[in-house]
Amino acid sequence: IVELSPGRGWYTEILAKYMFENGRYIAAPYNPNLGGYAERLWDNYSSLLQSNEIYSKIEISYLFDKMAEDESVDAVLTFRNIHNWINDGAKNAKIIFEQTYNVLRSGGFFGVVEHRAKINTSVEDMYKSGYVTEQFIIDLAKDTGFVLSDKSEINANSKDMKNYPKGVWTLPPSLRLKDQNRSKYLEIGESDRMTLLFQKP
């Protein structure tokens, strides 16, 4: 499997245990040579990788580079990242979706979890708020060649009104406003998220 932009490694901690004995796990973070946020993320992630033998077999590639050989991967996963890839409309997201399609075997799966925006939210507002419309991702995937295989409401949250001063980062776990209305945002909980499964024909 490939995990796109693993951040600080929350899902890596789970996935590495499943893949250690009989699997191949490729993590594809931002290249730290980009500096700034990418470098800080890599510092945190590389510290995790060095903390336990369970991470010793993880292979590293980078977003926008060649993640793996074409048609060599069974599944690609991304969790709450697509809003970061639409700062220029959809150019970066298209590149990553195409790279994902290319590395997957026929019949392979692309799993997506993302903060869910209200219908008809503009791309500009999606980028600012961190919420992305379900249709935007489905259309992007279909344009790349994927078929929507399944979807789940396991990560849905009907309390999430999606109209906060600091976007999705107002809610936990970020709590960007710190103590301001903290109990209110803790009561809402984490964001309403779509969970989509695409397949390469």
Where are these regions (language model features)?
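Conserved class I S-adenosyl-L-methionine
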Residues: 1-7, 34-39, 89, 108-136
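Short glycine-dipeptide loop
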Residues: 21-23, 104-110
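Class I SAM-dependent methyltransferase SAM/SAH-binding core
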Residues: 8-67
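A short acidic, Gly/Pro-enriched loop at the edge of an enzyme's catalytic core
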Residues: 66-77
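Short alpha-helix
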Residues: 130-151
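A short glycine-rich, Lys/Arg-flanked "PGG" loop and its adjoining helix->strand segment in the class I
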Residues: 17, 92-106
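C-terminal lobe and adjacent flexible extensions of AdoMet/dcAdoMet transferase-like proteins
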Residues: 181-201
